[in-house]
């Protein structure tokens, strides 16, 4: 605890001195200071909380001559206020009364029992059911010369106890943070590492917390091992430094040991298919480009029956394994679930899973001794349901190794279940302070105290009947009031019948009130029975929590198995409902998708046109041409999504699909200005293209959509041509290259590994019908004017564009110049077309021609067309009569 100078306390009351000491230890944290039924905030904390939470700011007296500004929240509603503050990135120290007000001399003893921060949430009320919350620490590693060589990362899901380490290059930091999405990031004081905007709440901690030797020892102590060799982490020095700071910070916020952090996973970048931030964003895995949660691949796949399964799905989507072995194991399990006999049907299994509690997070709270009564009853009911759940999958475990592993892990911890069954009431109260949590029969003393409290009325009735019979006083009454407690009342005319063991308690005008040894004994028990029962129940509950701690590893094992079973069952349900198939894998280079469909778009439309996609050693780049809105981007995205789904372990939306090795997926689809970073749309596009050209390998899948926009026509065309050539000649990756530069369709003549495909459309009048079918060969036109018309561009603009298009096509044909890209640069204004190369226009145009130019046949009714025809004939005759040719 920080010690303040005596001068700092001069003039302050004892209570404010206590507060100031506590606040000095948490200078950058809001302190919720418990006073009775409220948590109070003082001084600057009060002003800040009032502003953030819209609380009333009050002022009560002064301390050391300074007005005491106050704001408070009721203790029973504290969680809703904590949730708001954490969402804003704030941290809150919860300071509770731990002393007894009745026996305290001076202020009641208080201390901070926990600190709630964005990255250390465990309370159910503060957590999103389907999102994990990560605390991450980063530590820069240096060589002997002091040169930075890497960045060590350690991140912890405190709610589950999952701890992971990795070491990355500095340029990989943005991608790593996008994948992990930490809620809070710890960095050393004085560090210069640039954390990308929006990556998470940043927290500076003392640099010595990141000491590598101390961190390594702290990690070994946490995992109860002598060395980290068994986890493959012995050489990750900077990551161990980060882990040391992370564990120190997390334990400090909880005010206790992290008993559930018992394992460690080291992540290697070669373990998963690489997905950079642009790819995760463009494929809309868990969030749309508009920032909404639906429609996304995650929202389509998430039919999980438990929140554990939903969280695991999110993790799998962002961590598709490169090795196809994991995917094949999962798909084998899906097949077994789909082929299960009636007694182990998929529907029956999912119905049973809906009754399962969130064992993962309950276990986390149990380890931190913060589990509530209904957490324990839910854990008990889940463990009791495990035998029936295992019975449902027992018939099919032989057909799938993944299911056999899950089945073995679902063996219920018998001793844990016995303790929960005997100790916890069938339907306990929400909070221990409300009573009714410990089951009857678990503790004789508690049962007796409850009996006294619950049977008080009956005891008094029985006592009154016995005393009337014993004394012969017919109007004797046994009663109670708050001032005098229990008493026996006898009217004055009957006092001569009072036995010797009656002791006078109160004299009234017409009666005497007595107490007997038996009634006094009962009174002592009854008056304190409820209070003593609650205290006894609290002590018993705490002892139950302590007794459950040894079962944490078993609870974690069950939670992991339940999440995997639930997710596999959800994959099976999606495959059955949406007519998906199991993909196959090969070690050969290639991708073969027959009648593939975009999983998310298909769910949003009535009819979806399926398309094939084929890559191989002799076919590495597809040049995709066709109209805007024709489906080029959809076709590219669906190819990437089908590949990702296959490696995640799901069935895929296709008639058949086969995949060779894939190490990374890149996308260059669409872009927007990066205003905060000072980058234009074109700069963003080129940055993404550079990453692809530098990092793509022959096993990478690359999506390039209309590269070269945002600059001059010839600059853009030159860049697109050079980029496509480089991808073919040097990267040799699987590439889907959509373009409006029709000059690029000549590329297959130079590179046989390139092929032209196009999205077809049919012109109808001045309109267009998109067929969304992918065909071999290049498109014959872009249909840009028709798309513009569909978009609602005014008719005069469309007519002017048609005139200019005809002129440009005529000019191109006469001069043999390349076709211009109509979508990269706007055409010159019609009024500016009089240039040296333009044909001379007649000084006096024919009036009939002028009239014809202004006509839109699609807008004419039959009668109007006939009248116009007569008008044109009149104009021609009149013009000829004036002597014109």
UniProtKB/Swiss-Prot annotation:
Keywords: ATP-binding, DNA damage, DNA repair, DNA-binding, Nucleotide-binding
GO cellular component, one term: cytosol
PROSITE patterns referenced in this protein's UniProt entry, alphabetically: DNA_MISMATCH_REPAIR_2
Molecular-function annotations in GO: ATP binding; ATP-dependent DNA damage sensor activity; damaged DNA binding; mismatched DNA binding
Role noted for this protein: This protein is involved in the repair of mismatches in DNA. It is possible that it carries out the mismatch recognition step. This protein has a weak ATPase activity.
HAMAP family membership: MutS
Family label: Belongs to the DNA mismatch repair MutS family.
Protein name as it appears in the record: DNA mismatch repair protein MutS
């Amino acid at each position: 605890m920080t010690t303040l100078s005596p001068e700092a306390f001069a003039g302050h009351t004892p209570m404010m001195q206590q507060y100031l000491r506590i606040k000095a230890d948490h200078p950058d944290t809001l302190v919720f200071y418990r006073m009775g039924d409220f948590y109070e905030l003082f001084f600057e904390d009060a002003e800040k909380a009032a502003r953030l939470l819209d609380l009333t700011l009050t002022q009560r007296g002064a301390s050391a001559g300074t007005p005491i500004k106050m704001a408070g929240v009721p203790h029973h509603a504290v969680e809703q206020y904590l949730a708001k503050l954490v969402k804003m990135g704030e941290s809150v120290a919860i300071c509770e009364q731990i002393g007894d007000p009745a026996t305290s001399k001076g202020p009641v003893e208080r201390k901070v029992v926990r600190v709630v921060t964005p990255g250390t949430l465990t309370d159910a009320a503060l957590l999103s059911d389907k999102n994990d919350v990560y605390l991450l620490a980063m530590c820069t590693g240096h060589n002997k010369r002091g040169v930075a060589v890497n960045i060590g990362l350690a991140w912890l899901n405190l709610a589950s106890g999952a701890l992971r380490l990795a070491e990355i290059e500095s340029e990989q930091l943005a991608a790593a943070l996008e994948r992990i999405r930490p809620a809070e990031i710890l960095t050393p004081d004085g560090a210069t590492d640039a954390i990308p905007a929006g990556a998470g709440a940043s927290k500076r901690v003392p640099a010595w917390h990141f000491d590598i030797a101390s961190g390594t020892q702290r990690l070994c102590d946490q995992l109860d091992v002598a060395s980290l060799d068994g986890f493959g982490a012995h050489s990750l020095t900077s990551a161990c430094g980060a882990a040391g700071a992370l564990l120190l910070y997390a334990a400090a916020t909880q005010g206790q040991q992290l008993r559930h952090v018992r394992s460690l996973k080291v992540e290697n970048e070669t373990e998963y298919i690489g997905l950079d931030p642009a790819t995760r964003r463009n494929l809309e895995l868990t969030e749309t480009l508009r920032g909404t949660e639906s429609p996304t691949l995650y929202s389509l796949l998430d039919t999980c029956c438990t929140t554990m399964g939903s969280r695991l799905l999110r993790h799998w989507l962002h961590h598709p394994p490169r090795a196809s072995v994991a995917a094949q194991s999962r798909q084998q399990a899906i097949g077994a679930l789909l082929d299960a006999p009636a007694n182990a049907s998929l529907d029956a299994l999912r119905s049973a899973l809906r009754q399962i509690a969130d064992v993962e997070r309950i276990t986390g709270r149990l380890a931190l001794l913060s589990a509530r009564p209904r957490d324990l009853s839910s854990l008990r009911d889940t463990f009791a349901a495990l035998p029936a759940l295992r019975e449902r999958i027992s018939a099919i475990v032989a057909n799938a190794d993944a299911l056999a592993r899950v089945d073995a892990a679902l063996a219920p911890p018998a001793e844990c279940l016995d303790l929960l069954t005997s100790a916890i009431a069938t339907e306990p109260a929400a909070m221990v302070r409300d009573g009714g949590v410990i089951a009857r029969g678990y503790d004789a003393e508690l049962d007796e105290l409850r009996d006294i409290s619950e049977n008080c009325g009956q005891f008094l009735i029985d006592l009154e009947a016995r005393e009337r019979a014993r004394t012969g006083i017919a109007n004797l009454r046994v009663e109670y009031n708050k001032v005098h407690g229990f008493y026996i009342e006898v009217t004055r005319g009957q006092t001569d019948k009072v036995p010797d063991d009656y002791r006078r308690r109160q004299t009234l005008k017409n009666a005497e009130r007595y107490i007997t040894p038996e009634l006094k004994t009962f009174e002592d028990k009854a008056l304190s029975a409820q209070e003593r029962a609650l205290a006894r129940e609290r002590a018993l509950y705490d002892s139950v929590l302590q007794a459950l701690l040894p079962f944490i590893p078993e609870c974690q094992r069950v939670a992991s198995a339940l999440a995997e079973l639930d997710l596999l069952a959800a994959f099976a349900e999606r495959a059955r409902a949406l007519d998906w198939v199991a993909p196959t894998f090969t070690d050969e280079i290639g991708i073969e998708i027959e009648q593939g469909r975009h999983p998310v778009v298909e769910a949003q439309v009535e009819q979806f046109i399926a398309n094939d996609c084929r890559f191989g050693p002799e076919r590495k780049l597809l040049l995709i041409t066709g109209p805007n809105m024709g489906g080029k981007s959809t076709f590219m995205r669906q190819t990437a999504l089908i590949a990702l789904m296959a490696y995640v372990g799901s069935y895929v939306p296709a008639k058949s699909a086969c995949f060779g090795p894939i190490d990374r997926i890149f996308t260059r689809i669409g872009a927007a200005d990066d205003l905060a970073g000072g980058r234009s749309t074109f700069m963003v596009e080129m940055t993404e293209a550079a990453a692809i050209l530098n990092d793509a390998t022959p096993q990478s899948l690359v999506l390039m959509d209309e590269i070269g926009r945002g600059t001059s026509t010839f600059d853009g065309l030159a860049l697109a041509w050079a980029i496509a050539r480089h991808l073919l000649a040097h990267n040799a990756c699987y590439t889907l290259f959509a373009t409006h530069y029709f000059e690029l369709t000549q590329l297959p003549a130079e590179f046989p590994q390139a092929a032209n495909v196009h999205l077809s459309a049919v012109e109808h009048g001045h309109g267009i019908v998109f067929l969304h079918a992918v065909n071999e060969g290049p498109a014959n036109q872009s249909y840009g004017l028709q798309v513009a018309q569909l978009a609602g561009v005014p008719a005069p603009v469309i007519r002017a564009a048609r005139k200019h298009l005809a002129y440009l096509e005529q000019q191109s044909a006469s001069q043999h110049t390349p076709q211009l890209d109509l979508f990269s640069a706007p055409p010159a204004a019609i009024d500016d077309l009089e240039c040296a190369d333009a044909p001379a226009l007649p000084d006096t145009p024919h009036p009939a021609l002028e009239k014809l130019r202004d006509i839109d046949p699609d807008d004419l009714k039959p009668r109007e067309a006939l009248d116009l025809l007569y008008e044109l004939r009149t104009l021609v005759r009149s013009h000829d009569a004036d002597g014109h040719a």
